[in-house]
């Protein structure tokens, strides 16, 4: 017996990552169409990267359309992005894209992109959760492939045994 302390942000990150990865592998990513496409300007080298990886980005739910010489319209995003700053996330993604379309490098970078998007969309550490939300998070976490670590490898929960706790209170 003891007390299990769960980091809600890391736990939710694992849940989102597993869902997103599974959806990505099944090519069934839930997307959100933007009511007003986001116009973003890029450097010529970034435009080249985006054109090269447009199909792969589409598989992640990011629908881009070249608009003029150095601009893209972002038409859809993965539904898990919710209200996050889509332009900032796109900038991070562009920075992560490999220079070549080498399959192994692309797979590795997309793994990093999935992790980043999951992290950005996870419940924040200081956010209060009610009992139902806590139960749902723990239930969802138990259904993941690796419920003990986040995609970065950090532990999700720590178990403090009762004897250690009692010693802290000078009871043993």
Regions found by a protein language model. Give the residues of each.
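Long, charged low-complexity intrinsically disordered regions
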Residues: 1-172
């Amino acid at each position: 017996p003891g007390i299990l302390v769960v980091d809600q942000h890391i736990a939710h990150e694992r849940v989102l990552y597993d869902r997103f990865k599974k959806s990505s592998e099944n090519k069934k990513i839930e997307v959100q169409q933007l009511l007003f496409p986001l116009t973003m300007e890029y450097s010529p080298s970034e435009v080249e990267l985006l054109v090269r990886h447009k199909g792969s980005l589409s598989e992640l739910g990011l629908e881009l359309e070249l608009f003029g010489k150095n601009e893209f319209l972002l038409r859809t995003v993965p539904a898990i992005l919710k209200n996050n700053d889509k332009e900032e996330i796109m900038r991070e993604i562009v920075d992560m894209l490999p220079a070549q379309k080498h399959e192994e490098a692309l797979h590795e970078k997309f793994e990093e992109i999935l992790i980043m998007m999951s992290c950005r969309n996870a419940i924040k550490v200081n956010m209060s959760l009610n009992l139902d939300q806590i139960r749902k998070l723990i239930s969802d976490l138990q259904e993941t492939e690796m419920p003990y670590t986040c995609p970065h490898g950090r532990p999700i929960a720590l178990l403090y045994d009762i004897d250690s706790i009692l010693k802290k209170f000078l009871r043993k």
